[in-house]
Structure formats: C-alpha cells, structure tokens
From Swiss-Prot:
PANTHER family hit by this protein: UREASE ACCESSORY PROTEIN D
Subcellular location: Cytoplasm
Function summary: Required for maturation of urease via the functional incorporation of the urease nickel metallocenter.
Species name: Rhizobium rhizogenes (strain K84 / ATCC BAA-868)
GO cellular component: cytoplasm
MF-aspect GO terms: nickel cation binding
InterPro entries with a match to the protein in the record: UreD (IPR002669)
Superkingdom, natural source: Bacteria
Family statement drawn from the similarity comment of this UniProt entry: Belongs to the UreD family.
Protein name stated in the entry: Urease accessory protein UreD
Claim: Chaperone is one of the keywords in the record: yes
Subunit structure: UreD, UreF and UreG form a complex that acts as a GTP-hydrolysis-dependent molecular chaperone, activating the urease apoprotein by helping to assemble the nickel containing metallocenter of UreC. The UreE protein probably delivers the nickel.
UniProt keyword annotations, A-Z: Chaperone, Cytoplasm, Nickel insertion
Length: 273
C-alpha cells in the first residue's frame, strides 16, 4: 500500500484589502470595503471631512513567499489618510521573496496621504515592493516610506538580503515620477558606501505631487537643514530624502516634515502608540 507523504510546504501569509471612498454632504464616506486573508482595514472615527484608514497585516510580519495586496480608491473631492497599525516587519526568508503591492487611485480634487509606519528589514530578509499611483489632473498625493535595516537598539542589523522598491506615479495617464531601489546581497557593505547611506541604517523618501510643492519646499528645507538628506521641487512635485543613525533619530526629523506637508496636521494617532 502506498501512503501519500504529508506536505511539508510551509504556510504562507496571503492578504488582499480594498477601500474606496466617495464624497457625500461635504464628508468623505465609505463606498467599498473588501478584506481577505491576513489583510484587515480599520476606519477610526474622524471629525472633519477626511477619512483615516489603518491597514493591518494580522500575520504579524512577512517572510519569503508571503504576499499582501492593497487597493485604495479616492473618489472625486475625497480625502483619505492611509497608515499602518504598526511597523511592518520583514523576517529572514528561507526561500523565495515576500511581495507587497499597493495600488492607489485619486479622482478630481481628491487627496491621498500614504503614511505607513516604518518597514523593518531583518538580516536575510527578502522583500519586493511596488507602489502604483494614478492621479487625476487635479488630485494631490503624499507618500512616505521609511526603512530600518534592523533594530539598532536591539543589536540587530540587516547584513545580507534583498530589498526591491518600485514606485510609478502617473497623473492623467502620464508618468510623472519613478523610483527604483535595489539592495541585494551584501547589504551592510553596500549601504556603508558614501554614495549610498554612508553607514546609516534608517532612511526615508517622501513625495508630494500637487500644486503646493513650491510652498511646501520653503517650509521643509529649514527642517532638514543640518541632517543627512535634502529636498527638491520641480513641476508640481516635491521629493525629500533623509537618512539617520537609527529609527528614533529618523522619526525626530521625519514627523515635523510630514506635518509640514500636511498643512500642519499631525501624523495619524497610531504613530504615537
């Protein structure tokens, strides 16, 4: 008699979350909500015309072979702030690569602020991430992505591994911004180079696309002066890049910059928990 061997294939986390909003009576209201697998979306109460969405990976982190898909649709005249419940942790991958794909669409006069908390990459983590954004001609968009190469306070560092990050931002179908980052192999040696991170282990990119780019530049430059980084503005677009010695030092610079790019509004409350 032949007995089938039990599968030893490890379980993989899968999640898919979709949120769509519409404007109604001057407020941003929920139009569609879908969540599947490890993806959850929570909507804390707000007291203005915006909506706050907190996306959650109930798996508690990602490793090789896991995949999360997020979709955000902001209808005309809406405002959505999207953040994460906690820092996303990317653990050592025994095989394959974790994937995170985020799609954002903003209609006429809408604004979307994509404000996830930091992503922490542990040693031998493997992550491929993609952000695709489609903006109406009159929409505004703010994106913040911060990366920690390990947890310095815990004596942890990402020495080997893979991190790929791809952004494609389009306005009315035209490509207006592209990012392509790849850290592969000996990450510690690569990031030690002066032309890369000069040994810093925490870094971030902020992008604002909209009519206030020039105004924001004047507010942001004094905040980043004296730190490792800089800010540039052109064609209704502002890009800020920062690096710091650890996550705490990065946050001290990052949070005031985010607030400036949000007309003085604070970061989402979950950032303070």
């Amino acid at each position: 008699m032949t007995v089938a061997a039990a599968s030893t294939r490890p379980q993989r986390a899968r999640g898919r979350g979709h949120l769509a909003a519409r404007a109604l009576d001057g407020r941003t209201r929920l139009a569609e909500l879908f969540q599947e697998g490890s993806a959850k979306i929570r909507l804390p109460a707000t007291f203005d015309n915006s909506m706050e969405a907190v996306i959650i990976n109930t798996a508690g982190g990602l490793t090789g072979g896991d995949r999360m898909d997020w979709s955000i649709v902001a209808g005309p005249g809406t405002r959505i702030d999207v953040t994460t419940q906690a820092c996303e942790k990317i653990y050592k991958a025994s095989a394959s690569t974790a994937e995170v794909v985020t799609s954002i669409r903003a209609g006429a006069g809408a604004r979307v602020d994509w404000l996830p908390q930091e992503t922490i990459l542990f040693d031998r983590a493997s992550l491929s991430r993609r952000l695709d954004v489609d903006l109406d001609e009159t929409a505004e968009f703010l994106a913040v992505e911060a990366i920690l190469l390990g947890r310095k306070a815990m004596g942890e560092a990402m020495r080997q591994g893979l991190f790929r990050d791809r952004w494609r931002i389009r306005r009315a179908g035209r490509l207006i911004h592209a990012e392509e980052l790849r850290l592969d192999g000996d990450v510690a040696a690569l990031t030690a180079e002066h032309a890369v991170l000069s040994g810093q282990v925490a870094f971030t990119t902020l992008l604002y696309a909209g009519p206030l780019a020039e105004t924001y530049l004047a507010q942001v430059r004094p905040l980043v002066e004296g730190h490792m980084g800089g800010a540039s503005q052109w064609r209704d677009k502002l890009v800020v890049r920062l690096a710091a010695s650890d996550g705490f030092a990065l946050r001290k610079i990052l949070i005031p910059v985010i607030s400036a790019l949000r007309n003085g509004a604070p970061v989402p409350k979950v950032w303070n928990l």
